[in-house]
């Protein structure tokens, strides 16, 4: 009798636990906007990007569409007011957002077909620079670059015939606050100030590697910390 009661209880629990997962019948329907025309006009604006050319030579107009910014209510990062006067925020293709000196305008940014992102932003005199890279899901792009700051990855990279990097002269000073994050600095010959940067990797699903290098002169050294701290907090 006890066994029967237990089975009955187990059955009821099973029925109750599955009652929350509803299976609905498919019904064909035409899609509808869930926002008003006024809201769509304000949030989703067209901006021209030129032309997109296809393999057979034909071209069509190319447009981007704006969307509501999920961070417009404020970034979860505190920035000193004095530093804010000297900085601006850039959104870079396949790289993300980064703080750079406000008067910098010279930039090269590329997005690869495999999702990789690269950007180089330079001062007007091209003597200061911020360089960024994100390997996206390209393991062969990210893993060899990561070996410079994470030597324990070199064996895996070589086994996969990706190659890698070493620092036999100990030119780079590296601190690992955690296993997959590296803070680094090094001196470039004929450059007055050191380059500081952050390298990170994530190998939970596939291998992703990202890096920022910041080289600023003495007049802008106070901005190195905010730029790197912001990158570390948002990437």
State where each predicted segment sits.
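Sec-dependent N-terminal signal peptides
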Residues: 4-15
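Sec/Tat signal peptide C-region and signal peptidase I cleavage site
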Residues: 17-21
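Conserved polar/disulfide-associated segments of primarily extracytoplasmic proteins
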Residues: 23-68, 109-235
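Short, compositionally biased strand/turn segments
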Residues: 71-91
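Extracytoplasmic
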Residues: 84-85, 93, 101, 116
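Proline-anchored loop/turn motifs at beta-strand termini and strand-loop-strand connectors
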Residues: 93-109
